[in-house]
């Protein structure tokens, strides 16, 4: 077993029981009782059972010195990035010495990512929209759409007039301002998020509009290949060595108008990943979690599940399983899709599920009960699991089954589930050592890059003052343990990660 998990908690419980009995069975002073309780909490915390070696202790001492200094300054000034909206805090995070260390840290894997939200939008604007044959149109609602075609794309009711972007840029007075306007349409970033996004409906509307806007750029075959490569490059530069991507596998098109199917897309993911590994031999690779939107009818989802079964049979090393994406609050519940989701089991076919569940503020509804239904349907991991702390029995069951939650703090904040990340419900789960991994969801749409920003928010905000190098190490190892890789692949990954970790520790401890 790569990392100690909940199956090994009985030994810890015995130790904690011994600690408890020591002060219940004897007359301890208040100070002694206090010390015992603090020790108990320390051991329960995520990573609390890890024993650091000498070098790690030295690195931890330096890291915590910087962290405590930054937090004390925040207490003095009341300017604390995790308590602020990410759009307003990002520049402060980038000044942080702790953040610089987190960027250096080998983070293992990113296990919760969406296909067209993971490459920085600046690349999309400065690179992709400057390529030949790129056209733009504006729908009657004023929403941008893009299409590569020669000579021009086919017109429709939504796009009655296409303009070659190269010609359009020649006509605008300020090209830089135009490109900046594209960036504003490709991300949620704004200087005044509380004013612009007054509620969850508003921010989700813009969020889903962005996917509609950029889809025509990314799903052009030459761009698609480059996009997949660029996504690996950006995460590799952020010291992430493996990615699992939720992908809807929408049709990819050629300049001629020809369209490719899901198999072509999966094969392209596979080929591009192999090409990337050739020049980055420590990179483990990528897997695809085929996904469909939870707004669709049951019959459509049933067909998507059959497609997922076929893709996994044909590409067992690439396709990890299936998920449902889209806003939970307005989409179908897992219970609605139960019959469709039972198709693989009834047919004797193994199709792993990686369900989004509990990405909501509401309690006692079919929405937050998605967490329960995800577990009943044998989900491998729980995407977000924001509502898990409100369901103690479900929480205990997921812990017993060793099913982790995928925590995406910046996404949860930007999409208005929580404003101050110190109040994120996963803080309670971290304090008790619940299985979890950290990921970044759609970092490009939030103006972020890679995984480091989310790690910063967790380490500084959600984990509180006591989260230290043990916490970070446990999270990195968890990302390997809970990945969809085979055990032999996890062992290889762990060896590569360990070498990088030791170098990172030496750098932090000595520089």
Curated annotation (Swiss-Prot):
Catalytic-site annotation from UniProt: 359 (proton donor), 384 (proton acceptor)
Catalytic reaction annotation: adenosine + H2O + H(+) = inosine + NH4(+)
List of glycosylated residues: 127, 174, 185, 378
Binding site for substrate: 115, 204-211, 293, 326, 442
Gene Ontology terms for molecular function: adenosine deaminase activity; adenosine receptor binding; heparin binding; proteoglycan binding; zinc ion binding
Classification via SUPFAM superfamilies: Metallo-dependent hydrolases
Residues reported in the UniProt entry to bind Zn(2+): 112, 114, 356, 441
GO BP field: adenosine catabolic process; inosine biosynthetic process
Pfam family, one: A_deaminase_N
Subunit structure: Homodimer. Interacts with adenosine receptors. Binds heparin.
Comment field on protein domains: The PRB domain is involved in receptor binding, and may be responsible for the cytokine-like growth factor activity due to it's sharing of several structural properties with chemokines.
Main function: Adenosine deaminase that may contribute to the degradation of extracellular adenosine, a signaling molecule that controls a variety of cellular responses. Requires elevated adenosine levels for optimal enzyme activity. Binds to cell surfaces via proteoglycans and may play a role in the regulation of cell proliferation and differentiation, independently of its enzyme activity.
PANTHER family cross-referenced by the UniProt entry: ADENOSINE DEAMINASE, ADENOSINE DEAMINASE 2
Name of protein: Adenosine deaminase 2
